[in-house]
Amino acid sequence: MDIHCKADPFSAMHLSHIGHGGVNQLGGVFVNGRPLPDVVRQRIVELAHQGVRPCDISRQLRVSHGCVSKILGRYYETGSIKPGVIGGSKPKVATPKVVEKIAEYKRQNPTMFAWEIRDRLLAEGVCDNDTVPSVSSINRIIRTKVQQPFHPSSDGTGTPLSTAGHTIVPSTASPPVSSASNDPVGSYSINGILGIPRSNGEKRKRDDVLWSGNHLDGRKIGYHGSDGSGPNSDSQGSVESLRKHLRADAFTQQQLEALDRVFERPSYPDVFPTSEHIKPEQANEYSLPALNPGLDEVKPSLSTSVSSDLGSSVSQSYPVVTGREMASTTLPGYPPHVPPTGQGSYPTSTLAGMVPGSDFSGNPYSHPQYTTYNEAWRFSNPALLSSPYYYSAASRGSGPPTAATAYDRH
């Protein structure tokens, strides 16, 4: 049966071809795997030039919309209505002439992009729209044929690789490291890698005993023996193990005994210094009875000089108290005060410059509120004592309820 009208361009197609194709949804006949005839392609382009929409062209010629769009897109891009090659491989566009031109462009401008090379090939007439290689093909040509990798030969001197009009010059081979074969252990060091000759070993020798510092903390002594061996962590605190590594002529017997006493002393002394750290003559010199006469001499001169300079217009004063008086003045609940060594040895001018004038006077040091350990001693400010927050409702007695009373009950 013939479903084509007289004006249908498919009327030239025989019904024997229907076995390989069929009828599309628009009623047109197509042959599976074969392109549209050139007559239909030309008609599609003519209708498109007349301003007919692709959907109207598809319904009028009874060709699928995808086929019309593909033909028009190829025409707008390349200006050709010919179908693509079906089957087989595409014609080779990377001819030796094209490869040579691409290599020449890259030598002139190594940063030239592939699309710039493609445009230049078209501008210079080396290729036309049908034979110009694609951007991916140009990148592949540059990667495989223009910039071939360098393969050094077995003798260590690279062999220059060359293509048509393009030559890659190998870089100078680095000299082998001389110490790699001689010293397998030293070859992994920085000197071995850089090929620096090893210095004389005699210069690196040290004395039999090398002290790392002038301090002895009783736990560790820094030294390096000539044989490279030293006491382990278990024997560092042992005097006997240390003596084994000390030479007999390095220290005298008295020095060794002094070291023994230092090692036997605990690492962390008490907070209060003991008498063993002070020599007998120093203990007599800095004892409290020896310091009292000096303090008695300083007290009158200090009081008279300060009072004469400051005047008598001071409202509240705190005179300097000597060590003997302060030792006898003891507050309840506190240990007796022991004056530090050298108290009272400052000159009058120095004390006057260190403390403001309002803090010194010759009046006696008397504070009656500190005589007993009570609430008044704890809170010297009477304003704080009268505050309702420091007393409960029972201690205040009966009275009208206030906000503070409610606060205490809660």
Curated annotation (Swiss-Prot):
Q: Where is the signal peptide?
A: none
PROSITE patterns, alphabetically? PAIRED_1, PAIRED_2
What changing residue 79 to V does, per the record, is: In allele TY31A; no midbrain/hindbrain boundary
> What is one GO cellular-component annotation here?
nucleus
BP terms from Gene Ontology: anterior/posterior pattern specification; anterior/posterior pattern specification involved in pronephros development; cell fate specification; cerebellum development; cerebellum formation; cilium assembly; closure of optic fissure; embryonic camera-type eye morphogenesis
Summed up, the tissue specificity of this protein is: Expressed during embryogenesis in the kidney, optic stalk, midbrain, otic vesicle and a row of cells along the spinal cord and the hindbrain.
Gene Ontology MF term list: DNA binding; DNA-binding transcription factor activity; DNA-binding transcription factor activity, RNA polymerase II-specific; RNA polymerase II cis-regulatory region sequence-specific DNA binding; sequence-specific DNA binding
Biased composition, Polar residues: where in the chain?
A: 146-165, 229-239
Q: Which stretches are labeled DNA-binding?
A: 19-145
Q: Quick one: where's region RED subdomain?
A: 97-145
Instruction: Cite the record's Low complexity compositional bias ranges.
Output: 169-181
| Disordered as annotated region, ranges | 146-184, 221-242
Cite the residue spans of the region called PAI subdomain.
22-78
> What are the record keywords, sorted?
Developmental protein, Differentiation, DNA-binding, Neurogenesis, Nucleus, Paired box, Transcription, Transcription regulation
- UniProt-annotated location(s): Nucleus
What is known about what this protein does? Probable transcription factor involved in the development of the midbrain/hindbrain boundary (MHB) organizer and specification of neuronal cell fates. Required for establishment of eng2 and eng3 gene expression in the midbrain and MHB primordium during late gastrulation.
Protein name, please? Paired box protein Pax-2a
